Regions:
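N-terminal loops that bind phosphate or other acidic moieties
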Residues: 1-595
Length: 595
């Protein structure tokens, strides 16, 4: 039996304590009681404020220890992986930070073990003279009332909101009493809804793979719990918009009586949106998911705040959750705080490392129009008095691009072996953008007889559509070529050869050290330019380009990611030519065969 893939730790090591020590080592604002797994803020003056304590099983980091800090938690206690801490541990947290006069609020998620252990400690603490109130977070909508009627909704990412709101309220409202603050916590919880979606179960360090029922290919789970509790399996995996629409329906639809927990006025209600990384979703995808979540919101008003980060996780679970807090409903609650107070508490700065969103004031949040037009949009391209046969040039250009597209599968196959596999697609993106422009851009098509203007437009399309190193090289070379053509008095094979020569040697070579022999696109481009400049003979120039490309089969890469590939890979199939060199050769052959 093999272990799920994780780093290996000492056989007898308590990895929970180890990670808490790492947290404390990186955060000088907190201290640790390692024997009890309690992280606490020694700087918070609990003689003047109500103490906010939380805790639960490990594996949901940054919850709970990562939320200890100014204007957030005063202490957090961790159990073992996915297991509630003991009553002894919880009592240690209370005795470390609680003040008998001001009182303590304990925030926990709605799981049986947490309720039993924290509830028992709350009663024990009361018997010793402490004032203690429990706020139990239950924001999940995945499980309906009928199924959870004995235990209630699970606590998920909405817990982070309650931590932040109660922590800030306690720190900034020294005169608030314990009941008023706990009432705020209950009111927030009452108006929270959360639903998660995951591509797979989480892999727990030290747990055998055979003990985890992973999802199948092209399968996901909606409502998968943060302890691997089964959700509803969906196959095939839907498009992200379709998935998010389904999630919003489950979060908000009043038609689903079994799962409709919070009323929303779709036209008028104010709310806060939180997109939570359950652990294994990249930041890249998480922000993309957030944009789709915003685009598909069925609520008319924009959210008052948008938070995107990892708040409540489940190790490396490749999923996300959506949380909505209805602010407008708070006006109907019998509490001492307003919805504006709640936003103020969310905006209060904190040094807790787990609360990663930057803090902005209300004025900044209210300035919603964040997208502007590019200053490049209306730039006027340079035109010239040079003239060519525009119709013939278009025919040559289209042929060159089509030859390149025909070669794309081969280029991609070569680059998959000796590079990172993106060269073919990058070139295809550039080719397709130019072909599209020839159909849709009237200015481009009507000025094909002006080589300066035309190459300027082609450079624009290349810059916009081609990323990576090859995109940069093509863009610089074409920009330099435009500059040279502006200084040319007439178009001929020789004058174009001279312009290409100076664009290469005085332009592109200023920004790259790649030369013939380095196994790059230069191995095709440089021989072609040199031969055309020297002889003015297009046939000889094409032959030189072909020879240069062929010789890359025997070269070891010196530049780019290919320089890290084992030499044996280059010798496969009798030698693999450089993909970039093949691409340039395709363009040269395609363009010149129509002359």
């Amino acid at each position: 039996m093999t272990l799920a893939k994780h780093w290996k730790y000492g056989k007898d090591e308590d990895i929970v304590v180890t990670q808490l020590r790492g947290l404390v080592a990186s955060n000088p604002y907190v201290n640790l009681i390692p024997s009890e797994k309690v992280v606490f803020n020694p700087h918070s003056d609990t003689s003047k404020k109500i103490t906010i304590i939380s805790g639960g099983g490990a594996g949901h980091e940054p919850m709970h220890g990562g939320f200890v800090g100014e204007n957030l938690l005063d202490a957090a206690v961790s159990g073992s992986v996915f297991a509630s801490p003991s009553t002894k541990q919880i009592m240690a947290a209370i005795k470390t930070k609680s003040n008998k006069e001001k009182g303590t609020i304990i925030v926990i998620k709605n799981y049986t073990g947490d309720i039993l252990h924290f509830g028992l400690v709350a009663e024990r603490a009361k018997s010793e003279g402490y004032k203690v109130e429990l706020v139990i977070v239950s924001d999940d909508v995945a499980v309906g009332r009928e199924q959870n009627k004995m235990v209630g909704r699970r606590g998920l990412a909405g817990t982070a909101f309650i931590h932040k709101i109660l922590g800030s309220a306690s720190a900034t409202s020294p005169d608030v009493d314990l009941k008023s603050l706990s009432d705020l916590g209950h009111a927030i919880n009452k108006n929270l809804v959360t639903l998660g979606a995951s591509l797979d179960r989480t892999s727990v360090p030290g747990k055998l793979e055979e003990e985890i029922e992973f999802t199948g290919n092209d399968e996901m789970e909606l409502g998968l719990g943060i302890h691997n509790e089964p959700g509803t399996k969906i196959k095939p995996i839907p498009n992200i918009d379709e998935l998010i629409q389904k999630m919003y329906h489950q979060l908000l639809s009043p038609e689903d009586k079994d799962r409709h927990y919070v009323d929303f006025d779709f036209e008028n209600d104010e709310y806060v949106l939180l997109i939570n990384n359950i652990g294994g979703t990249s930041s890249f995808e998480l922000y993309a998911i957030a944009e789709h979540a915003l685009a598909n919101l069925p609520l008319k008003r924009k959210p008052k705040r948008v938070y995107v980060s990892d708040f409540v996780t489940s190790f490396n679970s490749p999923g996300f959750s959506i949380t909505l807090l209805n602010l407008s409903n708070l006006k109907k609650e019998d509490i001492s705080f307003t919805d504006e107070d709640v936003l103020k508490f969310l905006d209060t700065p904190t040094n807790a490392p787990g609360w990663k969103p930057k803090i902005y004031d209300s004025e900044i949040w209210n300035s919603q129009n964040k997208e502007i037009e590019s200053p490049m949009k209306n730039e006027t391209l340079t035109s010239s008095d040079l003239k060519i046969d525009g119709q013939k040039f278009e025919s040559q250009l289209v042929n060159a691009l089509k030859v390149l597209l025909d070669e794309e599968p081969k280029i991609t196959r070569y680059d998959t072996v000796v590079g990172d596999g993106d060269c073919g697609q990058t070139l295809a993106d550039g080719a397709n953008s130019i072909l599209k422009a020839l159909k849709e851009d009237d200015d481009f098509k009507s000025n094909l007889n002006d080589p300066v203007y035309t190459l300027g437009k082609i450079t624009e399309y290349v810059e916009d559509s081609m990323g990576g190193t090859s995109g940069g090289l093509y863009s610089i070379f074409l920009t330099a070529l435009v500059k040279q053509l502006k200084q040319t008095k007439e178009i001929s094979v020789q004058s174009v050869g001279d312009a290409l020569y100076h664009a290469l040697y005085d332009g592109l070579f200023k920004y790259t050290r790649a030369r013939v022999g380095g196994r790059t696109l230069i191995d095709t481009l440089q021989p072609f330019v040199d031969a055309l400049h020297k002889t003015g003979d297009l046939t000889k120039a094409v032959e030189a380009a072909n020879k240069g490309c062929e010789e890359t089969k025997n070269l070891r890469a010196s530049f780019g990611r290919a320089s890290y590939v084992n030499e044996e890979e280059f010798k496969a199939e009798g030698g693999i030519p450089d993909p970039g060199a093949v691409g340039v050769l395709a363009l040269i052959k395609g363009f010149t065969e129509k002359l």
